[in-house]
Structures are given as structure tokens and as C-alpha cells.
A protein has these predicted regions:
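Conserved structural core of kinase catalytic domains
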Residues: 139-194
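Juxta-kinase regulatory segment immediately upstream of eukaryotic protein kinase catalytic domains
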Residues: 1-76
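Glycine-biased, low-complexity coil/linker segments
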Residues: 242-244, 253-254
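Conserved kinase catalytic-core segment
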Residues: 183-218
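Helical subdomain adjoining the active site within ATP-dependent kinase catalytic cores
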Residues: 1-15, 19, 306-399
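Catalytic activation segment of kinase domains across protein kinase-like and atypical kinase folds
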Residues: 214-232, 261-323, 327
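ATP-binding glycine-rich loop module of kinase domains
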Residues: 77-127
Length: 399
């Protein structure tokens, strides 16, 4: 195979930035080792070239549903640095092959901590795909280690973007979709409701009610959930099922979320760990109590973000609670654990409704240890009582 044309790019909100010679000696952001972009890009290139591109061609064959061999030439490869985090330095890999284009995500771990997490994530993604066969997480295509880096080539969710809470000129909270290449899109509360609903549903679908395993950690500030909007200008689907206004949909008013699944679609980009949230002993706790604590944590953690993804910790509006409850219940009703034993679902709903407001507030206390030493904790502390009241109201009215 002839060597394909390979181009290095850096993603930005305004479009791709071609990498010039002067940029190659700049250090990666968020990297304590100060790895130069030159080493980063060249190591990625070496990883992709392994075994004369054969693993990469096999991955392209699976994505394009056509068998490619070493005789088929990759005419061009675009290696695009997408973002930089404390654990990984993700890139996207775009191939031009036989006149067709295919795109992958590539997680790159540089530090010892990042490499430990990525090794675990590779194994976990494979397990979750095997167990649940759901489309919400990226599928592993190639993984390996080279030049002291750990690599994971996985699905790229094309057309999906990060979202974050921000403040307008009047310091009013709003949600924005970060559409890299075209800028930022302001979202309505109705659209935000749908995003939180789907994110909550995804996490619940992957929850293991028998072993109490849960995908965590994740955080909106890290961009772990991403969103695709097919028709950004579409209005809410009228009417809501029971009155209510379109600015801030709630379960109490019977609002369904307002936007169809075809308009907004959510995916989860990572599964770093999969284990019980708290130190539950399987033979010593009722599985429904473990599920109860998953539910509490879901309602709480769904509200946390950082302003513009990097600023101060921010607390999402109340509609996020109703959205989390709706997404949780939708997923719960579809799980075999409850379908095979319908009485379990009713028993769990009775359990939720049995808590008084004061009991519900106290029940959050064990979860606070999860946030010890984080900037999330003070924000949770300031808002927890009102959050419990909102959740209690949603439980009593909706369930």
C-alpha cells in the first residue's frame, strides 16, 4: 500500500486549525509531562500504521459494511486533536478509503493515571457491549500501547456535540450546545429537559440491579454526554399532554418533554468504571434499596456542571429533576429484572413513595462522601434541601 496523505489538525469552535511546524513543539494542554504535539501526532500516526494498516482497515470494514484488504488504498488520513482532559487527550481519525469516508474516535492516555483508567475503560466497554447490546456507548475497534502511550480506537458519534450550562448577560442560566465548526447554539429549557431525560435513561439502562453496578464517574463538565440535534429550529411538539408552558416542562404538569427523539439524541462517550456506588454487600442489602441510592445519586449528579465546562460549579434548574425521574422510570420499566417480576416494580414505587420529606433529605447523607474534597460539594450543600423537596414532589405527584 502506498503511504496515504496524513494531515494534522486541531479542532476549534470556529473550525479546524491546520497544524504548522511552529505548533508542533507546543505542549499538550492539561498534560503535566508537557508532551509536545509533535510526539502526540507522530505516536498516533505510528499506532494507525501498525501491521501495514491492517487493523485499521478491518475497523473500517466493520463501519462501512464492506470488506477491505491491504490492496485497498487509504488515500488520506486526518488526525484531529479534539480536546484535552485530565485523563485523556482525545482525537478523531478520518479516513478516505475507496472514495468513502469513515471517522473514528481515538482516546490517548499519556500519564500513568490516565493509562490506568484507559486500560480499565477498554475492558469495560467490551463487557458492557457484550452484556447489554445497546447503542449508547462507543464500540472498541483497536486498542494498544506504543511509545509509552495507551490508545483506544472507538466509534465516533458523528454530529454529536458537548453541551454546557452558561450565563447570559443578565446572569440567567441557560444551556448551550457546543457545535464545533459553527459556534454555540442556545437551547430552550424544553430541549434541556429532553437531554437530561435521555441521559438519565441511558445510565439507568446500564444499571445492574442484581450486582448494583453503575457507570460512574461521569460529569457534564467533562463533556461525557453528547447531543445530536437534527433540526435545531424545530418548535416543541404541541400540545403537551396536560397543560403547562413550554419554557420549563415538568412532570407535575404532565409535560412529555416537548421534543421527539428524532430531534434530540443523546450518547455517553465514556464508561470509566462499573461498580456499586456505595459499599453495598450483595447478600446483606435489599436490591431495591441499592436501586434507591442509584436513583438519589442520579437525580443529584445530573444537576452538576461547570459554567462553560471549565468555570465555577453550577446547579441545573429544577426541570432537570423531573427529567431525571422520567428517564429513570422509562428505563426501569424496560429492564428484564422488572419485566420478569412485575411485582418488583410496584414494590420499588411503593418504597419511593413511603419516604417522608425529612427521611428523603437524610437519605442523601451517605452520598455526600462521594464528593469529599471536590468543588461540587459546597454547591450540593447549598442546594440539597430544595433539591430533596423538588424530588419528593416529583415522586409523590408522578409515581
Amino acid at each position: 500500500m502506498r503511504k496515504p496523505f496524513i494531515k494534522y489538525l486541531v479542532s476549534s469552535p470556529d473550525g479546524d486549525i491546520p497544524v504548522n511546524a511552529g505548533m508542533l513543539d507546543v505542549s499538550l494542554e492539561c498534560d503535566p509531562y508537557e508532551t509536545p504535539y509533535r510526539v502526540y501526532f507522530q505516536s498516533i500516526e505510528e499506532f494507525l500504521k501498525q501491521d501495514e494498516f491492517i487493523p485499521l482497515l478491518h475497523a473500517a470494514s466493520r463501519k462501512l459494511d464492506k470488506e477491505y484488504s491491504p490492496r485497498d488504498e487509504i488515500s488520506e488520513i486526518l488526525i484531529r486533536a479534539e480536546k484535552h482532559g485530565l485523563l485523556y487527550h482525545p482525537a478523531s481519525i478520518e479516513l478516505i478509503l475507496g472514495g468513502r469516508k469513515v471517522k473514528f474516535g481515538l482516546n490517548v492516555a499519556v500519564t500513568d493515571t490516565g493509562k490506568t483508567w484507559l486500560r480499565e475503560e477498554i475492558s469495560l466497554l467490551q463487557r458492557l457491549h457484550s452484556k447489554y447490546k445497546l447503542p449508547y456507548l462507543p464500540e472498541v475497534h483497536i486498542s494498544g500501547e506504543l511509545n509509552s502511550f495507551v490508545f483506544l480506537l472507538e466509534d465516533w458519534f458523528e454530529g454529536y456535540h458537548e453541551f454546557h450550562l452558561t450565563c447570559d448577560e443578565e446572569r440567567k442560566q441557560k444551556m448551550q450546545l457546543w457545535k464545533f465548526g459553527t459556534g454555540y447554539l442556545n437551547l430552550t429549557d424544553t430541549q434541556g429537559f429532553e437531554i437530561y431525560r435521555q441521559a438519565s435513561k441511558i445510565l439507568t439502562l446500564y444499571y445492574d440491579p442484581e450486582n448494583f453496578n453503575y457507570i460512574y464517574p461521569w460529569h457534564h463538565a467533562a463533556g461525557d454526554f453528547i447531543v445530536k440535534m437534527e433540526h435545531e429550529k424545530n418548535p416543541p411538539l404541541p400540545p403537551f399532554s396536560k397543560g403547562g408552558d413550554t419554557k420549563s416542562p415538568t412532570l407535575a404538569k404532565g409535560d412529555s418533554g416537548g421534543f421527539s427523539d428524532k430531534t434530540i439524541d443523546v450518547r455517553l462517550t465514556t464508561a470509566r468504571r462499573y461498580r456499586p456506588l456505595l459499599d453495598f454487600q450483595k447478600n446483606e442489602i435489599n436490591p431495591l434499596f441499592a436501586l434507591f441510592y442509584f436513583f438519589l445519586h442520579l437525580s443529584l449528579h445530573m444537576r452538576l456542571d461547570k459554567i462553560d465546562g471549565v468555570g465555577e460549579v453550577v446547579w441545573a434548574k429544577d426541570y432537570s429533576v423531573d427529567a431525571a425521574v422520567q428517564g429513570f422510570l422509562e428505563a426501569l420499566r424496560g429492564k428484564n429484572y422488572f419485566n420478569n417480576y412485575p411485582s418488583r416494580y410496584e414494590e420499588f414505587i411503593d418504597l419511593l413513595r413511603s419516604f417522608t420529606l425529612d427521611e428523603l433529605k437524610v437519605s442523601f447523607n451517605p452520598l455526600l462522601d462521594l464528593y469529599a474534597g471536590t468543588k461540587d460539594l459546597p454547591v450540593i450543600g447549598m442546594n440539597l434541601d430544595k433539591h430533596a423537596e423538588k424530588l419528593y414532589h416529583a415522586i409523590q405527584i408522578r409515581l
